[in-house]
Amino acid sequence: ATVKESSLITPEGSEAEIRNIVLSVGDAADFGFSVGQSIGVVVPGPHEFGQSEHFRLYTVANMATNGSGDEIEICVKRCSYIDEFSGEKHAGVASHYLCDRQPGDEIIVTGPYGLPFTLPEEKTADLLMIGLGTGIAPFRAFVRHLYEHLGGWDGRVRLFYGAKSGLEMAYMNDRQNDFEMYYDEATFKAFTAVSPR
């Protein structure tokens, strides 16, 4: 896949760096991706602990926004972790690799993985989605699918989303608010919560 765009979706000054990364994958239909599935990202090595490559799954945040069917988007937070034994801080291998990619860079993707979201047969059924942090990614694709590809949903659609701070509300902050476009849909409501833990 080729990186087409990597845009910061958290405001400057936010403790978290969260990026929306657009990948050109040829024809996404050839991959057979469905809303709710993940792609695998292979990070070439060698790595700190001797692995020849590192593998990480990312849920597809959106598909084919350009109308040609060749793009998918993923939501990536630059992560670090503390080694339990040494107390040392280590950079997340895949998240740092992806956040450092520039347009035109090639990356290895595999997939799809996981089961797609299944909708109830009746469009009058209520839908409840709960996500935290970058866990909002699959719901972004799902809500867009409901209202843009299926022509709407008659049941109540509720999204509950939380983050450590308002600055970390991916796709729901001053820099980017994708869900705002669905607020005029009679059946959609989004609720946010902030918790420092």
Stretch-by-stretch model annotation:
Residues 2-102:
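Ferredoxin-reductase
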Residues 92-197:
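FNR/FR-type flavoprotein reductase catalytic core
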